[in-house]
């Protein structure tokens, strides 16, 4: 039971307490490019979770036989392997989404979260905790992207997951010249950073200890 609780802690800490985009401010560059729709955000979150979890597991598994002098090169090779696997998987089964994400799946290898978890956690703990930490970090990254993408897609396109949420009848037309119009700002890249900044601010307020009066 104690072991199970310990394993669960690795996962939950990475998911919320040590959330990489909100607390460590890592992996935020992709928030600019892949959060215009919920579909792309979900896909990127899944891809990063897979790569981070699996690469952390393998790095931990090989930690005792990996020479210190080449450990970062070895970690990059391991990460590259899983990035190639997820990239080929998306191209084979979800080609449209893969085409939309373009080079950003391949650029997961440069994501600070993946290397950060391998270097700071996976090479110091056993494989199962390393995997849970990597998976939690990836999912923590993913839910932040999804939250941003929901707002951007809703107000930028009037849809969520491609389904119409804001009725067409509310939009500006010849019959309704003063109707609703999509917020063009939400489609632009800077909106992702504004929304991420607001999320970081809210999380810091929630996490901040209450001052004693």
Swiss-Prot record:
Its EC number is 7.2.1.1. It catalyses: a ubiquinone + n Na(+)(in) + NADH + H(+) = a ubiquinol + n Na(+)(out) + NAD(+). GO terms for molecular function: oxidoreductase activity, acting on NAD(P)H, quinone or similar compound as acceptor. Keywords: Cell inner membrane, Cell membrane, Ion transport, Membrane, NAD, Sodium, Sodium transport, Translocase, Transmembrane, Transmembrane helix, Transport, Ubiquinone. NQR complex catalyzes the reduction of ubiquinone-1 to ubiquinol by two successive reactions, coupled with the transport of Na(+) ions from the cytoplasm to the periplasm. NqrA to NqrE are probably involved in the second step, the conversion of ubisemiquinone to ubiquinol. NCBIfam families: nqrD (TIGR01939), PRK09292.1 (NF006777). This is Na(+)-translocating NADH-quinone reductase subunit D. The lineage of its organism: Bacteria, Pseudomonadati, Chlamydiota, Chlamydiia, Chlamydiales.
